């Protein structure tokens, strides 16, 4: 048991006819409290410890603390000031008193403290004002104790507590402890249990619905005249060819084109995901604000702009097929067509003229598709997936040339190595390096330290340094010998970026 000093300004409570009455002490009193309580001094939180390097006992903590506050018995012959009387009296017999939590007290000289979340002990040499924090069982005690705690008739082993995350341990134990004396918490626990039951019911319904959908799909019998091709859970129907009408042949060619376009897009997505898997660069928006989803690489300029936007929205599938087919057989015709489309879209300004251009393009596309449909199927089969993969590989190579400015730079690699050497593994070092590399010049980065980089990164995400990060030393990112090389690398990097633009 440790002691704290209580002045005449602190309110104490005692039971009287099933009600709490308030009193104050006339003279300073040394109040005994159990070790293990949390105390806030300034902005830091500490744990009161009875002896240094020895963890407190949780059983004594629970026996001396309740929802009303810290329990202690005041001896007789102590002068008190009763409520609403204004004069002082003396106790004729000992009185059981409750010191409420979140009250301001004085910690005397010699009080032993342990800083929360850090294995560091302190011994006070002067009186300090502190606030008893509203916490009964600190989470740091539960982690290291190998005892069984009896809460509402249920024993909780340390093995069970170690499986719960740190931020949940303290809340669960505090709720169970309050259920002894406060019946109001039962409604809160009921609502929590109801929400858990609802989530379980939803998961069961989803499983049942999946089984039902499987049964319905099995019972359906497809028509013999329609062929179904499956690609990644998407069905596309292909009608059989008929030589009677040219309209049927047009429909069949459109369906085959749509299936090939979907395959090409899927193959391109799968290949882009596999490339550059070793190094992941974060990207920023134009406003230089940090976001995890937006890429950090600069936007490419379209060196070869294609048709107008309206033309892409309306006939995107037809454009994909026609452009690929004409690039192989009729390159001159496709280039002339694109030039004509560009000149028409630039000259036209009014809405009426834009509609005319769209109608012309659609009519030209319909005529070209109808003429191509009369050709043999062997010419259409020449567009294989291998050619689409070659087109995708060419696009990926252009993207790698632009991002090589970040990866191949010596200073960028040094920055990554320094951050990985001094920062904790909980931070994503690649994200922090890219955020600093894009938003600040090399001259400013040379003057920064590891702690400066971390604080700037967290401020960009509307966060602040944690208590553990305050003890991080501000190591320099670059040595004095490396500063001469950084200017040259920065100029080379900027010239490469300008050339790519």
From Swiss-Prot:
Annotated Basic residues bias: 201-214
Coiled coil: none
Bias (Polar residues): 333-352
Domain of life: Viruses
Bias kind Low complexity: ranges: 231-274
Comp. bias intervals (Acidic residues): 379-403
Region annotation (Disordered) ranges: 179-404, 480-501
Compositionally biased spans, kind Basic and acidic residues: 191-200, 215-226, 304-316
The protein's name: Uncharacterized protein L157
Organism: Acanthamoeba polyphaga mimivirus (APMV)
Origin organism lineage: Viruses, Varidnaviria, Bamfordvirae, Nucleocytoviricota, Megaviricetes
């Amino acid at each position: 048991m440790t002691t704290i000093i209580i002045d005449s300004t602190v309110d104490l409570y005692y039971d009287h006819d099933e009600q709490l009455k308030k009193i104050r002490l006339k003279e300073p009193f040394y109040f005994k409290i159990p070790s293990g309580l949390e105390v806030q001094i300034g902005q830091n939180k500490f744990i009161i410890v009875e002896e240094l390097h020895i963890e407190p006992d949780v059983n004594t903590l629970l026996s001396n603390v309740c929802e009303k506050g810290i329990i202690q018995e005041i001896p007789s012959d102590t002068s008190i000031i009763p409520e609403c009387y204004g004069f002082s009296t003396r106790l004729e017999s000992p009185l059981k008193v409750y010191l409420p939590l979140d009250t301001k007290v004085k910690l005397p000289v010699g009080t032993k403290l342990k800083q929360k979340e850090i294995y560091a002990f302190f011994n006070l040499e002067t009186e300090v004002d502190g606030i008893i924090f509203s916490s009964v069982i600190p989470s740091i005690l539960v982690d290291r104790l190998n005892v069984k705690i009896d809460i509402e008739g249920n024993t909780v082993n340390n093995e069970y507590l170690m499986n719960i995350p740190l931020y949940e341990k303290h809340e669960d134990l505090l709720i169970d402890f309050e259920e002894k004396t406060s019946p109001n918490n039962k409604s809160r626990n009921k609502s929590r249990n109801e929400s858990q039951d609802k989530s379980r019911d939803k998961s069961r319904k989803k499983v049942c619905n999946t089984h039902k959908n499987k049964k319905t799909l099995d019972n359906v019998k497809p028509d013999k005249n329609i062929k179904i091709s499956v690609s990644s859970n998407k069905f596309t129907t292909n009608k059989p060819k008929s030589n009677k009408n040219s309209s049927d042949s047009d429909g069949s060619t459109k369906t085959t084109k749509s299936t090939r376009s979907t395959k090409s897009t899927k193959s391109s997505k799968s290949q882009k995901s596999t490339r550059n898997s070793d190094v992941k660069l974060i990207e920023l928006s134009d406003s230089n604000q940090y976001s995890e989803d937006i890429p950090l690489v600069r936007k490419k300029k379209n060196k070869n702009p294609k048709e107008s936007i309206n033309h892409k929205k309306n006939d995107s599938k037809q454009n994909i097929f026609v452009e690929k087919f004409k690039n192989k057989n009729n390159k001159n015709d496709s280039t002339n067509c694109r030039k004509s489309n560009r000149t028409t879209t630039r000259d036209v300004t009014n809405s009426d003229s834009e509609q005319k251009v769209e109608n012309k393009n659609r009519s030209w596309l319909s005529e070209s598709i109808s003429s191509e449909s009369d050709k043999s199927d062997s010419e259409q089969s020449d567009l294989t997936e291998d050619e689409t993969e070659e087109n995708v590989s060419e696009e990926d190579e252009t993207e790698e040339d632009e991002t090589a400015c970040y990866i191949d730079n010596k200073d960028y690699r040094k920055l990554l190595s320094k951050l990985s050497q001094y920062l904790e593994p909980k931070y994503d070092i690649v994200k922090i390096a890219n955020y600093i590399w894009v938003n600040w010049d090399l001259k400013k980065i040379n003057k920064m330290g590891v702690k400066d980089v971390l604080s700037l990164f967290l401020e960009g995400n509307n966060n602040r340094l944690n208590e553990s990060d305050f003890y991080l030393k501000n190591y320099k990112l670059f040595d004095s010998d490396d500063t001469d090389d950084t200017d040259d690398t920065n100029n080379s990097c900027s010239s490469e970026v300008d050339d790519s633009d």
